[in-house]
Amino acid sequence: MEWNESLLRLTVAFVLGSTLGIERQWRQRMAGLRTNTLVAIGAALFVIVSVLTNHDSSPTRIPAQIVSGIGFLAGGVILKEGLTVKGLNTAATLWCSAAVGTLCGQGLFSEAVLGSMMVLVANIALRPLSTFINHQPMHSTELECHYLCHLVCRGDEEANVRRILLDSLAEIKNIKLRSLRSHDLDEFNHFVEVEAAIICTARKDKFLEAVISKLSLNPSVKSVSWQALEQESG
């Protein structure tokens, strides 16, 4: 392979990797422009090494190692915050950037361009569709989700904490408060336990976690938790 052919393959990998990275950078993701570009260039370099090695009898060996190696980098951008897992789409984009770079290293430019376009369509065009689907209730099964929230607060702040809890729950759509009870934990009324039973027409784990996190910041709240109970079909 001539040096100008290697330069062409690396340049195409640079351009396509940057294209994928711009979309991630625009959404302010952890792995953005530079990361996706470097992944594509690195994958292309490894494949070029394989091509330049005349005695290499297994042309798929290097791409297989690239697929394995990119898993460590992709795993580093996946974060778990409470019940929410973030970074899965960014990790998948990194994986695709490695594939695009591998194609460029092999000189398969048409396939690399087509793959990049498909990744961009998946990240941009399918985003509104996935958001729309996530917000749709499950009409066919009409699931009814039950939750139970517990919190312990100071007795003199019970009324204020109950008000904050009710106001926070009121901001969540399709949710009903089944009961709200409280009882003293000691005879001197130093601490009170408040228990709220909630019914939703769909899973509201993320919203309840936000409510609980907000209440936990209140200095008068000693402890707070929530749990999902059984799901009943209507």
UniProtKB/Swiss-Prot annotation:
Topological type in the membrane: Multi-pass membrane protein
Transmembrane in keyword set: yes
InterPro entries: MgtC-like_C (IPR048640), MgtC/SapB/SrpB/YhiD_fam (IPR003416), MgtC_SapB_SrpB_YhiD_N (IPR049177)
Main location: membrane
Cellular localization per UniProt: Cell membrane
Keyword list, A-Z: Cell membrane, Membrane, Transmembrane, Transmembrane helix
Record-stated family: Belongs to the MgtC/SapB family.
PANTHER family: PROTEIN MGTC
Protein name per its UniProtKB record: Uncharacterized protein slr0014
Organism, as annotated: Synechocystis sp. (strain ATCC 27184 / PCC 6803 / Kazusa)
